A protein has these predicted regions:
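Typically disulfide-stabilized, N-glycosylated extracellular/lumenal ectodomains of secreted
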Residues: 2-16, 20-252
Length: 252
């Protein structure tokens, strides 16, 4: 990650064309959530079980850099106001969560530039490296995002690529930046023009936490996710969603 840069304070929703606003994925209950910070560009110190707000910005890769240095999307020096799209999430700290960005079609996010950056905080301005989401040829639908905390303060965010062994040899898939990617023409709304594809290519982000909370309790979900990788949690949740949708469709 680039050297830590102090971000210019700014309310995140004002910095983007906000087309995506998602509810909390794991639903930290009000009575169990001790974190009262809901702004992704503000600093928070959390315990296990608290809610934690972060954002994901979608734009071209170069839009996240200024003078060759990657900045937080909260930083007003980045030219994101009229081009980027934003998703906001509030998962529960140290719970395994799968978040879905409910884009209207594959082209909805690729038209923003095809890359995404996760971010949170102001003092440390934690941000992930830009990761490829999609273009007119291929779209990645499964991601793993790791939060690294120290005494309850977010220090780092990074994407963990799973490699391409699971899609090797499949006609509708390719390997892009060490991740399996489906042909965008197979997606609903493929190529940004409401294509004929039938696959829901909305990005799914699996979360994991590492480090320590503000009480110095160890966050273990990254270890749990790494051990469960062989079972493909993203595939498990996707299959469950498809199964439930199929069962409900039988009632109509």
């Amino acid at each position: 990650m680039a050297a830590t840069t102090t971000a210019t304070p700014r309310r995140a929703p004002a910095a983007f064309v906000v087309l995506l606003l998602l509810a909390a994925a794991s639903g930290a209950s009000a009575r169990g959530d001790g974190n009262g910070v809901y702004e992704p560009c503000a600093d928070a110190t959390v315990s296990r079980g608290d809610g934690f707000t972060f954002g994901v910005a979608f734009a071209g890769r170069d839009a996240f850099f200024s003078g060759g240095v990657q900045l937080s999307p909260c930083d007003g020096r980045l030219p994101l106001q009229n081009t980027a799209k934003l998703a906001l999430f509030r998962p529960t700290v140290d719970e395994i969560s799968l978040l879905t960005v409910n884009a209207s079609g594959a082209g909805d996010l690729t038209s923003a530039g095809g890359y995404m950056v996760a971010f949170a905080g102001r003092k440390f301005a934690a941000r992930s490296p830009p990761v490829f989401v999609g273009n007119s040829s291929y779209t990645v639908t499964g991601f793993t995002l790791v939060f690294e905390f120290h005494k309850g303060t977010l220090q780092n965010l990074f994407w963990k690529a799973d490699g391409c062994s699971s899609c090797s040899g499949q006609a509708n898939f390719g390997c892009v930046e060490n991740s399996c990617a489906i042909k965008t023409s197979s997606c609903r709304g493929g190529n940004g023009g409401g294509g004929a594809g039938q696959v829901d290519c909305s990005p799914g982000i699996q979360l994991a936490f590492s480090g320590t909370d503000k009480h110095e309790a160890v966050l273990n979900s990254w270890y749990e996710v790494s051990k469960l990788k062989q079972y493909s949690l993203f595939g498990l949740f996707s299959n469950l969603k498809d199964s439930l949708a199929g069962q409900f469709s039988n009632f109509f």
